Amino acid sequence: MPIVSDKQKEATSLIVEQLVQSGIKLVASLPDDWIAPLIDAVDKDDRFKHVPVNREESAIGLCSGAFFGGIPSLALMGASGLTTCIYAITKINYSYHIPLFIFATLRGVIGDPRPHHISNGLYLTKLLDSISLPFLLVEERKTIERIPAAFKHCQAMNRPEVVIFSEAVLLGDA
């Protein structure tokens, strides 16, 4: 794992504490370099059951099943992974009114030098809007504190909700 700065550790700790405040018990994750410190923190924290999965749809299925077991959960993935899950989300979670809380990264925006993520920057939020999937865009540190409210909204609606993090927030620079 790359070296993690003190600012990044602090941002990660703040996010983890918001998960605890939300009552999250299970986290299903897929690797993404922007959220690697968060995945590592959740994995090492006894307050969570962390399940690494190999496909985004597996995280969707696991977290949806956890709902029926009364276990508050989170699917943690990159932006590309989220875009591949749209069918599963609309088929399972929308059809059967299953809440699903998702964290994703905001890739392909100004400042992201990786050309293979440009489509995420262009289309991710528009795609979510097109299927009426609410999201909280976290581009400033103070917005992290809204995570429990987003989780509560997701549960109240019995529908998915996404929290999308900018790289600056995850690095502790915003």
What kind of region is each of these model predictions?
Residues 1-174:
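Thiamine diphosphate
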